């Protein structure tokens, strides 16, 4: 693994040199310096949630969209949550994605985005931001409307949710395929469900920044649902009875190619139900990448700023192919190239000056 040692404040110049003659004090835990909430105010537009470096899945909260500054789905001034979407942009100047939104609920709900001036108008809940936890590869927040604590972590192609429910005969997980990021609009959606009451799958086609975007998903629950119902072709509800403090896990895998591709990705990347091990693996993936650059300073604030910025450079571009290499090309045909990984969300007009040159050093 390439190691780069950087002396502040001339970090940018010394990154280009790719090394220094002096060795800083040994450091092994770099994720502890990352504060994913840096950049969530003003015009920062950064993603908050769980992912791994360059992962296809960025699973995290999506608020009721308001203005341009909500294009990542999260703004520190807003505590609404309409669900946890599996794709997000970060740091961009335009909105899109928010594909396959999932929301744990209790009781009857209105199947819509809703408005903040009417709490019963949609699926949304306020989040208790005072108890919100976010670190590389892990996100957690209590939803005050439903009394549910939502946690999530991820592999490259799979989001893993853990919901802690109150005692209820009306607990449920709602899949929302209508929700999209700002200018994104669903054009074709649908669901399938299995006979064993533990799996559902489907697709979401949309238009927006990407004129014809196609995402397929496969989801699996840690226990059978008591009832499954669809509301049109854009919403589905899997219902459960829960005891107080019961934890329900949900895996959601994505594919740019097909439902079968999503099922293959799920089986390959997350066959087990070990939430803690998955979160630890995500943390390790981030630590491995962050440790490629070491800075010679004892200033904790400088480390927090530096490693958070480095973390943000690896939210995108994101993998956009299946584990077997299948991907959908710009010609909308399915391709497979051995040894090739397809990526998307480059947003080159934002990144070509600094982030892309950095990629040539850290990820040649």
Role assignments for model-derived ranges:
Residues 1-8:
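Bacterial N-terminal signal peptides that target proteins for export
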Residues 23-364:
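Accessory carbohydrate-recognition regions in carbohydrate-active enzymes
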Residues 15-18:
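C-terminal motif of bacterial Sec signal peptides marking the signal peptidase cleavage site
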């Amino acid at each position: 693994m390439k190691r780069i040692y950087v002396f502040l404040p001339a970090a940018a110049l010394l990154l280009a040199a790719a090394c220094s003659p002096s060795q800083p004090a040994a450091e092994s835990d770099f994720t502890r310096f990352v504060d994913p909430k840096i950049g969530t105010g003003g015009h920062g537009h950064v993603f908050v949630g769980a992912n791994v470096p360059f992962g296809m899945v960025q699973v995290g909260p999506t608020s009721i969209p308001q203005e341009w500054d909500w294009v990542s789905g999260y703004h520190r001034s807003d505590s609404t949550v309409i669900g946890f979407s599996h794709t997000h942009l970060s740091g961009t100047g335009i909105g899109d994605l928010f594909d396959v939104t999932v929301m744990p609920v209790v009781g009857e709900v209105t199947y819509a985005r809703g408005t903040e001036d009417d709490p019963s108008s949609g699926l949304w809940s306020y989040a208790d931001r005072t108890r919100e936890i976010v670190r590389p590869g892990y996100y957690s927040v209590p939803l005050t409307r439903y009394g549910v604590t939502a946690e999530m972590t991820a592999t490259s192609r799979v989001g893993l949710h853990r919901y802690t429910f109150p005692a209820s005969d009306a607990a449920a997980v709602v899949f929302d395929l209508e929700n999209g990021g700002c200018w994104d609009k669903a054009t074709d959606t649908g669901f399938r469900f299995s006979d064993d009451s533990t799996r559902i799958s489907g697709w979401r086609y949309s238009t927006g920044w990407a004129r014809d975007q196609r995402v397929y998903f496969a989801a699996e629950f840690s226990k059978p649902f008591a009832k499954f119902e669809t509301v049109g072709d854009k919403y589905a509800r899997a219902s459960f009875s829960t005891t107080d403090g019961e934890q329900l896990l949900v895996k959601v895998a994505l594919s740019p190619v097909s439902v079968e591709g999503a099922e293959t990705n799920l089986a390959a990347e997350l066959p087990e139900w070990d939430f803690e091990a998955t979160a630890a693996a995500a943390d390790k993936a981030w630590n491995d990448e962050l440790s490629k650059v070491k800075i010679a300073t004892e200033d904790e604030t400088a480390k927090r700023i530096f490693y958070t910025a480095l973390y943000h450079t690896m939210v995108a571009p994101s993998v956009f192919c299946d584990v077997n290499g299948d991907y959908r090309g710009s010609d909308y045909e399915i391709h497979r190239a051995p040894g090739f990984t397809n990526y998307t969300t480059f947003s080159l007009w934002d990144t070509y000056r600094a982030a892309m040159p950095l990629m040539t050093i850290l990820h040649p």
